[in-house]
């Protein structure tokens, strides 16, 4: 991926770098009580679920990926999900607000390839930063992505523009990407900002009320509404 007219973004996320600056990175993802749709832009050599989730052991109750899942039984993780992947998104369920911290992680190569099947794919955004949807999806596959669902937000591909409450991909977030066929792509991060977009309108609640995020979500895009003949 290019990051300027003459330079390439290396696997460490450095514009014009030679890949030699990659040291282990430390970062944390802030989680609210309930289900959080996350991804990882760096994972340690030991990417087992027990190691990756060790900072919130006893607070995390389960992790759900696409077609895989694991539950914490009080002493061990059990289930079909055993290794965390930098290209996958995950629902992380916790019983209290906390920070999921990863130490000495290997930064994910920004040009990593995603192989998606037709339908819903639970994917990551593999870089610590933000890019708007249209810029982040290569032109040759953008038309094959009909919609994208995040945690409490969504965007619909209208052909000439994206509409909805989701406006950008953010590092650390997971996304359901809905495709009309099988595609292979890498995100275009040439216009990426290191400042994450926080303008999405997610779940809101009346005063003195709480909203608990569910892993089951539905979104509706309404083209026309007629009320009392208006």
Predicted regions and their residues:
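Extracellular calcium-associated, cysteine-rich motifs in secreted modular proteins
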Residues: 1-25
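N-terminal exported-region signature
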Residues: 24-219, 227-230
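Nucleic-acid-binding surface
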Residues: 222
């Amino acid at each position: 991926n290019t990051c300027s007219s003459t330079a390439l973004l290396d696997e460490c996320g450095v514009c014009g770098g030679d890949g030699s600056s990659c040291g282990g990175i430390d970062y944390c993802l802030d989680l609210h009580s309930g289900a959080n749709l996350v991804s990882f832009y760096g994972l340690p050599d030991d990417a087992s679920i027990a190691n990756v989730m060790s900072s919130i052991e006893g607070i995390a109750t389960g992790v759900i990926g696409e077609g895989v899942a694991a539950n914490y039984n009080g002493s061990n993780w059990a289930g079909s999900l055993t290794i965390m992947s930098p290209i996958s998104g995950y629902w992380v369920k916790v019983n209290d607000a906390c920070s999921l911290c990863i130490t000495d992680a290997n930064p994910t190569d920004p040009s990593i390839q995603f192989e998606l099947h037709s339908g819903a794919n639970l994917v990551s955004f593999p870089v610590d930063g933000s890019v708007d949807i249209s810029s982040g999806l290569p032109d040759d596959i953008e038309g094959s992505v009909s919609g994208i669902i995040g945690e409490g937000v969504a965007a619909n591909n209208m052909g000439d523009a994206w509409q909805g409450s989701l406006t950008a991909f953010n590092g650390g977030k997971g996304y359901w990407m809905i495709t009309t066929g099988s595609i292979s792509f890498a995100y275009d991060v040439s216009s990426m900002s290191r400042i994450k977009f926080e303008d999405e309108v997610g779940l809101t609640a009346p005063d003195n009320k709480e909203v608990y995020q569910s892993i089951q979500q539905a979104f509706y895009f309404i083209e026309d509404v007629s009320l009392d003949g208006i």
